[in-house]
Amino acid sequence: MLTQSQTKQEEDQTKKNKYQQFGITVAGGNGNRNGQELNQLSYPRGIFIDNDKSIYIADCLNNRIVKWELNSNEGQIIAGENGKENQNNQLDGPLDIIFDKKNNSFIISEFFNQRVIRYFYKNQTNQQITNRNTYPFGLAIDENGFVYIADIYNHEVRRWKQGDKYGELVAGGNGQGNHFNQLNKPTFIFIAEDHSLYISDWNNHRVMKWKKNAKEGIIVAGGNGQGNSLKQLNHPEGVVVDHLGQIYVADSYNHRVMRWCEGEEEGEVIVGGNGEGNQSNQLFDPMGLSFDDEGNLYVADSKNDRIQKFEIVL
């Protein structure tokens, strides 16, 4: 049994997690923006890592979802290989993807089709979750199977239960703005075990935390104007929170990933931050973030058309 001091020591060590500064390209990175081959990506956005370290990618400009298995040289198309439209087998501008374990299905946000769909890969059918008056971006799902959807142009996040027609407002919805009860183009989101919702408030250059049933959020990263100091963010995108409550955010226009601890005035650069570029220690508009079960960090390096893996330093 661990003593209190040992537990604290372990937590302190975890808080000091470092990552290799030179990323490994694990998907894409084989050509220009218009690359449609199976070894290419075009402006990847949301990602998630399966238990077997397969990477699922919203390959946005190729209008498809692709799966890259561990150590694979190319991906396989999971959804959307039939052109960009709104039919069952088509996608148009997929931005994020999550997996619903209870229903063994993927949840996909499609910006240009203004819909979120539940996609069953085995029989290649889908069900529409939202109505057509949304502009869906980031997705999250809780242990009850409720789906959270960031609506970038309605400046709100809604929670959708099975059969909902409009969803339930859980954050924002008070017009576009920078007050604590407002959002300004929310992009990616993360739901914690206590149902606190973390939102990349893109045009306010901050990450907001909305506790369950809260009427307003609190700033947990950024919020000091647009900039590149350690107190600032510049159009945040992907956001994930670890088991210690540390917030990892893709600081997109600063081409870096930052880590913030709630209550602290500034964050720290975890990877990137070496200028816009395509070297292994550089990023170019990072988007989605995800961890594997070993704690390695994956970044959708969108304008380099690749997924970068930054290994944890043990």
What do these predicted regions represent?
Residues 52, 60, 102, 111, ...:
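Short loop/turn segments immediately following the C-termini of beta-strands
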Residues 54-56, 105-107, 146-149, 197-198, ...:
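Conserved beta-propeller blade signature
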Residues 284-314:
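Blade-level signature of beta-propeller repeat domains, shared across WD40, Kelch, NHL, RCC1
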Residues 49-52, 99-103, 141-144, 191-194, ...:
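Residue-level detector of Asp-centered blade-edge/turn motifs that repeat once per structural unit
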Residues 230-262:
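Loop/turn-rich, solvent-exposed surfaces of beta-rich toroidal or solenoidal domains
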Residues 8-43, 72-95, 122-137, 164-187, ...:
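Gly/Pro-rich loop segments of beta-rich domains
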Residues 63-66, 114-117, 155-158, 205-207, ...:
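Structural signal for beta-propeller blades
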Residues 68, 99, 116-120, 160, ...:
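Hydrophobic/aromatic beta-strand positions that recur at structurally equivalent sites within the blades
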